[in-house]
A protein has these predicted regions:
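Domain-level signal for soluble alpha/beta catalytic cores
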Residues: 1-217
Length: 217
């Protein structure tokens, strides 16, 4: 009930601000990715692993111990609640498969690519259910494409394309610039962006408040 109340407040704030596209404020999530990543089969949530974050610091992460599969729709109720509480266009976000593969300790798969592709299959199932539930836009959050561009080129784009395979609704992908990380020397542009022309994604969301950021691709 408290999360529902907080979500309604977030919706009304966005409406009063005049936003055309409304989100639920993600009040129900402990993080942008773990809400989905820890709800999957093949993940040991009781004994987490360790992986390096975007700034190189070790963090507790989901530990993959078996085949990654979606057990049930994770965010469908979020969409249904959002749809019932606004008449504006609505957007929901899901953690991207490449990013989830980078935020996991892989104790099962022979390669990170195989892990990312199974995450992608689970995300694909989720996206289909989110559109059925009333989402107008589904966005995949892929901050690690900017943080680890070589791996993103090697198999991240393949995983993203698998996640979007056969999807007909409006989709977006968000790539962070890394504002949350304590990095003293910041790059002036994105390390992974033109590559998204090889994806069926219809919209690219980037961060552009960074001083001196060159938005050219």
């Amino acid at each position: 009930a408290a999360q529902d109340d907080a979500t309604i407040l977030a919706i009304r704030d966005q409406e009063r601000a005049g936003l055309d596209i409304i989100t639920d404020g993600e009040m129900r999530r402990e993080s942008y990715s773990n809400r989905f990543a820890t709800a999957l089969d093949g993940v040991d949530v009781d004994n987490p692993g360790v992986a390096l974050d975007r700034s190189g610091h070790p963090n507790p992460v989901p530990r993959v111990t078996g085949p990654v599969r979606r057990k049930y729709p994770v965010e469908v109720r979020d969409v249904q609640f959002l749809r019932a509480n606004t008449d504006r266009k609505i957007k929901i976000t899901v953690a991207g498969p490449f990013t989830m593969s980078q935020q996991a300790q892989n104790d099962f798969y022979d390669s990170e690519e195989a892990l990312a592709l199974d995450y992608a299959a689970a995300v694909n199932e989720e996206i289909r259910d989110l559109f059925k539930a009333g989402a107008d836009i589904v966005q995949l959050d892929e901050p690690y494409m900017q943080a680890r561009p070589e791996k993103a080129r090697a198999y991240g784009l393949k995983a993203l394309n698998r996640a979007l395979e056969g999807i007909e609704g409006e989709t977006a992908v968000h790539i962070c610039f890394g504002y949350a990380a304590i990095i003293h020397v910041r790059p002036s542009g994105y390390s992974f962006l033109p590559e998204l022309t090889q994806s069926p994604v219809r919209c690219v969301s980037i961060e552009t408040a960074q001083s001196s950021l060159d938005c050219a691709i």
